[in-house]
Amino acid sequence: MKKSLLLLLTLLLLGLNATSSFAKTDKPNILVIWGDDVGMYNISAYHRGMMGGSTPNIDRIASEGALFTDGYAQQSCTAGRSSFVLGQHPFRTGLLTIGMPGAKDGISDKDPTIAELLKNHGYVSGQFGKNHLGDQDHHLPTAHGFDEFFGNLYHLNAEEEPESEFYPKDPEFHKKFGPRGVLHATADGKIEDTGPLTKKRMETADKEFLAASLDFIERAHKAGKPFFVWHNSTRMHVWTHLSPEYKGKSGYGLYADGMMELDDGVGVLLDKLDELGIADNTIVVFSTDNGAEKFTWPDGGTIPFKGEKGSTWEGGFRVPMLVRWPGTVKPGTIVNDIFSQEDWLPTLLAAAGEPDVTKKLLKGHRANGKTFKVHLDGYDQTALLSGKGPGARDEIFYFDAGSNLNAIRYKDWKIHFTIMEGNISEAYRKSPSWPLIVNLRMDPFEDGPDSSMYVRDFYADQMWMFVPAQAVVGKFLATFEEYPQRQAGGSLSIDAVMDKMKAAASRQ
């Protein structure tokens, strides 16, 4: 009898402990893993063996969750990263231009990050690896809701510029215009410069960032806190400096070797979730900041789309995008609907228990000790991901780094009013006599305009869409009256955007 009572008491205590532990972590953890300039076809879940090189750990996210065919970012680093963490189009926040060492522009404290909004739900947030949202202390993630940051602030080739024989040797020049080192910062205002990100350090920097992400996850788990971790690998931005461990490992060249390193890191993160027993309560997202950079091949990515990073063809904006969300996303799902990086903020806030964050922010919403009044350009895509409804997004706006609106996509149709042609180092705008029209379900790689029969057999019958396209852009720009641009991202005003688009349409 005593043994039975003891057993019953033990079971009750175990049950109470389990319930107490679950209560602390009932909100889903969020792990967002980003590569840098990663090509869609450099991931084997996309290339399906067409190319050499495999990424079994990244593929695992797809097989246990969803793979997106129409996932969109922006045309370059800063724009793509800001759109994700702020949920606003970078034309609105003024973050379309690539952030540089010594620059004064960067993320504004008037725009809430995912980390700040998650504070209301008890989350701890860490960002590790590349940031690229501003050079100054007040731009650092820890000034914008993140509890900890360990990483670099710029694109890799900017980090190694001081090693050039032509780089000015004057210490004052470097102090004013040179890249800062790899920083370790915390929300209490402490900032430690751990030293420059040299070519040599680039060989193993991702291991440093990986260790920091793992440590943060473990500490959050032990504290019973839901976490948001944004882990940013340096792979595969140029120039790639591999450690001896990965040189020649794939048998398919430098890029595939680097992808093996990136994939191994993803595997370590996924294994950590399994080890801690929290994989079933963690949303995992994999993506990147912009379209692949192809002109530096073989130290460049591979994609099936026309164009590349810096252009306004699909190759500049479409990115690999995968999500594993146990209990919400059915394993093996293929998502063909339009999904943009801005959509993650309202979607993840809905997962945390706040599906109306967009409406709240329009009126004024308090988070992280501040009141924010902003217009989110992202949509809550929970219904799409859960299979309970259609996608919420119909449109994509293709702005370049100079704040020029070059093209729009509305549902299946894309209209190029102007085109950013070429690679990011020499891209130039060209204005076709008539705007180009592409049906992206018929012609996802935008080959049609190169066809000799394009005008006669397709284009001439589609000019009806010029005026409706202006209405779509007009609706977007109308929101700027109450929620204006945060800072000038270029020389083009909102009125000029509409004027140039109308002028392009009138040329037909």
Model-flagged regions — what are they?
Residues 2, 7, 18-435, 440, ...:
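Formylglycine-dependent sulfatase
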